[in-house]
């Protein structure tokens, strides 16, 4: 998710972060020590965490049971925090969550098809 987020989206779209945008930064309440460099769209934090969460959901829900939802709640909290601290617009984290979810679902299905729970058989 991280590489595709950077090279397919960030370096193609080149959207400034809310805290870096000269027209918008006066409206941002930045809650971190500095505004990160780089571009904003998509949020790789959201993509990475939703990718992992959906991979775990697809691959391990039978093993982890209801605990698998903890990963999805964690991903949602990370995504919300990116907007809350002022380094992403809401659409950045929404797009990151969707992109990460698609990758997580795809890799989870591939994992189940080719490896599955054979790793637990001993």
Where are these regions (language model features)?
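Membrane-interface interhelical connector segments
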Residues: 14-33
